[in-house]
């Protein structure tokens, strides 16, 4: 069976995870060793052991940081997977589905080699390339930097992403603190601070601060967009994969012996009967007007029987598909929860990114978005949209349509949503951007 073959493939992939992770960490360590032997006479990749310039050293240091980060991730994966899957045998190679796994001796040799490489690079190595760069290089204008320096900075940032994330979160907290109400308007305080920074006599530090702020903003945008795409793609992919390869085969196998199961609810049954009646009436009509040969009662009965068999299989599959949707959506929610639970740092960055987009919009743009949102979800025509959404959800989960529940939901939920929106406008937006609230009221009138 295809399902058994798929499960065997997944099992084999899981059994090979420790070996695969260790090999990738080992190859990354070999890359670092290659850079050391080729460019640094076999010594540590650092400025004091190099005959190159600052730009070239920054490139090599960024490369090593990337490999060190990869080693760290793969060793973590190796330890976690090895504690779950017992892959290694006692000093002898084992064969698993034709794949020879690594022995304990080979594993220890690779780990010793990795330790000998990463032992040279301590925690302070992450800041070493910045400390040793001359002041003339640090104070160079951003427009005069070459493409190679930009590439090395990008790789250096990706390798030390946690450090940058901490700085972004700290800057976010300081920005949120400025949003608290004070004696003077926030815009006036921000303008005064900007003028003060521009006339600061210590120009070098100001330029470095502006450049650092630009880098943080750029990577904050990249991280936010990637995380938003991850929140969308991971649940959808989980829903489709679990439904196609796991849940649907199990549901079909469970209901295969239950031939009496055809309709999951009364609405589908009425829809099938209505379609069968239309088919019978169409046969009589086409025979009467000469579009088809006139059939006898026995022939009409035979055609109706064939159509009934087709409809029974069609509506049976629709019911099974609805049951599979329930479990697949549960798996999708679990995947979404895992992504959110293990991405607290990314969530902080995304919140700051969205706050920056919202508060940097013009007053008319803010008012336009508020009116658009309210008209779609709580406006005069919104009940029709909510009704379509509820009917679609009922079909998706195979639930019978309940008009009373739909009317009750439409009568209460948009009202609650409208109340929350008005409270947000009164409590927060009125304090942060009073002119946007005034523009919203004028546009609404």
UniProtKB/Swiss-Prot annotation:
Signal peptide: none annotated. The chain crosses the membrane at residues 227-247, 322-342, 369-389, 405-425. It is a multi-pass membrane protein. It is found in: Cell inner membrane. Pfam families: CemA (PF03040). Keywords: Cell inner membrane, Cell membrane, Hydrogen ion transport, Ion transport, Membrane, Transmembrane, Transmembrane helix, Transport. It comes from the Bacteria. GO terms for cellular component: plasma membrane. InterPro entries: CemA. GO terms for molecular function: proton transmembrane transporter activity. Belongs to the CemA family. Required for H(+) efflux immediately after light irradiation to form a rapid H(+) concentration gradient across the thylakoid membranes. Together with PxcL, contributes to transient H(+) uptake following dark to light transition. This is Proton extrusion protein PxcA. It comes from Microcystis aeruginosa (strain NIES-843 / IAM M-2473). The gene is pxcA.
């Amino acid at each position: 069976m295809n399902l058994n073959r798929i499960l065997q493939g997944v099992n084999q992939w899981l059994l090979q995870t420790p070996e695969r992770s260790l090999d990738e960490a080992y190859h990354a360590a070999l890359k670092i060793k290659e850079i050391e032997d080729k460019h640094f006479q076999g010594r540590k990749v650092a400025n004091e052991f190099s005959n190159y310039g600052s730009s070239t050293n920054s490139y090599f240091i960024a490369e090593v940081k990337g490999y060190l980060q990869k080693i760290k991730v793969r060793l973590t994966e190796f330890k976690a997977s090895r504690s779950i899957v017992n892959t290694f045998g006692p000093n002898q190679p084992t064969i698993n589905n034709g794949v020879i796994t690594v022995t304990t001796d080979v594993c220890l040799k690779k780990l010793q080699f990795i330790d000998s490489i990463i032992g040279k690079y301590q925690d302070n190595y992450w800041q070493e390339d910045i400390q040793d760069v001359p002041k003339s290089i640090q104070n160079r204008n951003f427009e005069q930097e070459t493409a190679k320096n930009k590439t090395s900075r990008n790789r250096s940032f990706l390798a030390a992403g946690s450090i940058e994330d901490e700085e972004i979160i700290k800057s976010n907290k300081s920005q949120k603190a400025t949003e608290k109400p004070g004696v003077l308007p926030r815009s006036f305080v921000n303008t005064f601070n900007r003028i003060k920074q521009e006339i600061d006599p210590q120009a070098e530090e100001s330029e470095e601060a502006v450049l650092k702020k630009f880098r943080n903003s750029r990577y904050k945008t990249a991280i936010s967009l990637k995380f938003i795409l991850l929140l969308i793609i991971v649940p959808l992919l989980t829903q489709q994969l679990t439904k196609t390869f796991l849940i649907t085969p199990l549901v079909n196998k469970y209901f295969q012996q239950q031939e009496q199961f055809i309709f999951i609810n009364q609405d589908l049954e009425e829809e099938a009967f209505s379609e069968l009646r239309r088919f019978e009436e169409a046969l009589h009509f086409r025979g009467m007007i000469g579009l088809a040969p006139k059939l006898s009662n026995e022939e009409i009965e035979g055609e109706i029987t064939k159509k009934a068999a087709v409809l029974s299989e069609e509506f049976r599959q629709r019911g099974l598909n609805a049951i599979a949707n329930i479990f697949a959506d549960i798996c999708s929610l679990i995947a979404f929860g895992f992504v959110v639970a293990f991405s607290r740092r990314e969530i902080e960055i995304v919140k700051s990114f969205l706050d920056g987009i919202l508060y940097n919009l013009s007053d008319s743009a803010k008012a336009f978005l508020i009116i658009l949102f309210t008209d779609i979800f709580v406006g005069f025509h919104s009940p029709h949209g909510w009704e379509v959404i509820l009917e679609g959800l009922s079909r998706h989960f195979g639930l019978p349509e309940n008009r009373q529940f739909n009317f009750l939901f439409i009568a209460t939920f948009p009202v609650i949503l409208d109340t929350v929106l008005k409270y947000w406008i009164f409590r927060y937006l009125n304090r942060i951007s009073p002119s946007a609230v005034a523009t919203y009221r004028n546009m609404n009138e």
